[in-house]
Amino acid sequence: MASPSKAKEVFSSDEEGPAAGAEEHHKVKVSSLPFSVEALMSDKKPPKELPLAAAGSSADGATVGTSRNMLLPGHGSRDAHSPPGALTKTFDTASVKSENSEDGTSWIQEAGRYSPPPRHLSPTACTLRKHKTNRKPRTPFTTSQLLALERKFRQKQYLSIAERAEFSSSLNLTETQVKIWFQNRRAKAKRLQEAELEKLKMAANAMLPSGFSLPFPINSPIQAASLYGTSYPFHRPVLPIPPVGLYATPVGYSMYHLS
């Protein structure tokens, strides 16, 4: 008859035997996983076909999930070594992108469907200036009449009533026509005189040194008339402003001697 100590040892060995066998079997299964550290370090290719096993243990479930990921088309070795949750994230991202693209397409279609109709802009009417209905036609002067009027204007810019009546009858024109022509000619002479004075002033300022100015305003009518040989307004100056004589004279010296 065996002693109690031997029975305990046999009992303990019987209990430890199945437990040790289960641990060794678990280690073998864990080491055979394709995403374990040993498999990654050894660079061994995972088996293409895995034997079917019962879905009882967690290790078998992980192995089956990994085999499903490997058998899916479009997934390479990166998906084979990735955890099972990565596939779910990939499907979620793809579904979100498809929903966003569908929403954008529908929004574009709705925007094109409800676009406002094009507006037809009518061209703005250009309003032309209308002349008076009772406006008299422009008098066509002949060449001989224009030459006579120009000679008379050079002699005298303002005509008296008697002179205008006599001059208009000699040209076969009315007094009103002669009067209007003289008014227009005086306005033209004034514009020409102002342009000549402006050119003269610009030329004088260009020749003067910095900080020096003319002792009188060149645009005043009295001083401007002194620059001309006669009182005729549209004559060119007999002597333009000489730079040497102007520099030699003092500032307060006038230029009446130039004429």
Swiss-Prot record:
Residues 1-11 have a biased composition (Basic and acidic residues). Residues 1-29, 47-124 are annotated as: Disordered. Residues 134-193 bind DNA. Its main location: nucleus. It is found in: Nucleus. Residues 90-108 have a biased composition (Polar residues). It holds the Pfam family Homeodomain. It comes from the Eukaryota. One of its GO terms (molecular function) is DNA-binding transcription factor activity, RNA polymerase II-specific. It comes from Coturnix japonica (Japanese quail). Belongs to the Msh homeobox family. This is Homeobox protein MSX-2.
